[in-house]
Every structure is written in structure tokens, then in C-alpha cells.
Amino acid sequence: MTEQNPAAEEQQSAPRRTIKSFVMRAGRMTEGQQRGLEQGWPKYGLELADGLRDFDEVFGRSAPRTFEIGFGMGHSTLEMAAAAPEQDFIGVEVHKPGVGALLSGLVSQKLTNVRVYSCDALEVLRDCVADASLDRVLLFFPDPWHKSRHHKRRIVQPAFAELVRRKLKVGGVLHMATDWEPYAEHMLEVMNVAPGYRNLAQDGRCVPRPTERPVTKFERRGERLGHGVWDLKFQRID
């Protein structure tokens, strides 16, 4: 799945270029994706420029709320939202084909518990989501940036952990999954020392595969190649 950029530091002098943990790819949209964008965006789309939102007002109710960073083509988002109509989902993706695909699915399934941003997810977290308002934050199969010189691009960094912690309710959970073991180790290194979190794994490492996480193409691909998948859950405790 596509992932997003680390939280930008506050700028007090001349602007500095923010390191991005995603690359904007020029993907051509199918007719179905374009149709989904045109038909679905007016109902499901939200704009970063609108700033801080009251999501109870956006959804027309108060319900458990999940924020998904980088939903890719939206397959997992659709499956989770359809399986849990009593919950609300905010999905963010930078790549337009994926946004169009998810919107097409939302329109065809007539789901009402999903809203979509098409921009940098951590800018949405920072500017549009109230503190202590999310029950879950999902980060499934982010780009591992394999090369050492690119590790600074990995989304899971101390600043990311703190931003997510602020947006989670006390008791809320950050759920991450990766099919790249070195990235799982990196996630553990960052999160096990991040203030205000508790690792939900009994051994202080990874949790068994959660039943609520849909099987993704990344997971199926990894299984074919003999790779494992590592799930990590960290709960906000203060």
C-alpha cells in the first residue's frame, strides 16, 4: 500500500524541503476509476484545505473511528467498512487510480461509513483531525525503503509515533503490518521506546495475525514467495 510522509517539523526560518516517504507515480486511470472519482468524490471526498473537521458532523453520528494511511487500491478499506457498518473509516491515499478505485467500490456497494482524502495522510492527521479522537490508526504494508540511504524516508519515525499518539484516544491502537522483516524490526525499534505507548504483543514484539485485517495482495504475494507478514499493535496509554 502507498504510505505517506513523516510529520513535518515546524518551520521558524526559511522553509526546508520535507522528506517524503512516498513517490508520486504517474498512473493512468481506468474508465471505471475515473467514473468512480467523478461520481463518488462529491459524496465521499474531503479536502485538506478545509482544515480541522468535526467528524461526528461529517458522518452524521458518533461512532468508533479508524484512520487508514495509504489505502492503495482500497480493497481492504472496502472489506473492513462493509464488515463493520457500526464503525466509521477515514481513508487517505495520494495516488488517484487508487482513490478512483475505492470511490467506485463505495458507490457500487452504497456504503456510507467511509470518507476519503486524496493527499498526504500525515498532513490530514496534523491539520484536519482533532487530538484524542481516533480509535484506530492503520498502516498496512508501507514502503520499506530497503536501501540504507533511504531509511530516513520510512514513515515510522519518532515524529510519526508522536503525531499518531496525539490523535489516538487513550486506549486507541496503532496497527501496522509489513511483509519485510527488517522493516518490522525498525518499527519495533521506534515504537518500543516511543513515549505513551504499550506494545500489545505478549512477547513485546509482534501480535498474531489479527482476524480484522483483510488479506491483501501484498500478503498473498509474500506467501507465494515464502515471506512472512508481521503485525504490530501499539496502544496509547497516556
UniProtKB/Swiss-Prot annotation:
S-adenosyl-L-methionine binds at E68, E93, D120, D143. Pfam families: Methyltransf_4. Pathway: tRNA modification; N(7)-methylguanine-tRNA biosynthesis. GO terms for molecular function: tRNA (guanine(46)-N7)-methyltransferase activity. The active site is at D143. It is an enzyme of class 2 (transferase). GO terms for cellular component: tRNA methyltransferase complex. The keyword Nucleotidyltransferase does not apply. Its EC number is 2.1.1.33. Keywords: Methyltransferase, S-adenosyl-L-methionine, Transferase, tRNA processing. Substrate binds at K147, D179, T216, K217, F218, E219. It catalyses: guanosine(46) in tRNA + S-adenosyl-L-methionine = N(7)-methylguanosine(46) in tRNA + S-adenosyl-L-homocysteine. Belongs to the class I-like SAM-binding methyltransferase superfamily. TrmB family. Catalyzes the formation of N(7)-methylguanine at position 46 (m7G46) in tRNA. HAMAP family: tRNA_methyltr_TrmB (MF_01057). This is tRNA (guanine-N(7)-)-methyltransferase.
